Amino acid sequence: GLELSDKWESGVEERNGTMIRFRVDEELFGEYSYNMDYVEQMVRNYTYLNLGLKIRLNGQEYVSKNGLLDLVNDNMSSEPLYAPIHLTGEDIEIVITHGGGYGESYYSFVNGQYTPQGGTHQAAFREAIAKTIKEFFRKDYDPSDIRTSIIAAVSVRINDPIFESQTKTKLGSKDKEAGV
């Protein structure tokens, strides 16, 4: 894009960061419309993955103080069966709880990229949950029973990830189960 001005907007509280205004070139794209639900979800995801990041979109401010814990809490449709477990490491962040539903609900990310189709990192996480519960209780529970009603978020940072398509919706890297 073209830089139109290097002056600060009036009323800006802080003099750091970047302000971006985006307008579609109607000569190139004609009458273009935004899917604002999609844009808002992307903005929310960026704030969940970058603690303290503030993004203003159409006058609404988005910020997360607790990372993926906020993502899980914001997407709970009912009270969890137990307080979400939030684990962070150098290259990984995980939040897990169980709700009152019957399915499995995952939010997965690789290097800040939302991977709605999951991938090897999510598969490794699912296996690790089942294995941990089975070993802890010394019972041969069926993994699907353990994961029923799970609500979890997984974010990994890995070098040179390999995705299964150009859209980066599913991680295909097999290196050490993609960080999990």
Residues covered by each model-derived region:
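Sequence-level detector for tyrosine residue identity
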Residues: 32-34, 38, 46-48, 62, ...
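GHKL/Bergerat-fold ATPase module
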Residues: 89-180
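Alpha-helix C-terminal capping segments
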Residues: 71, 86-87
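Intrinsically disordered, low-complexity regions
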Residues: 25, 46, 68, 78-82, ...
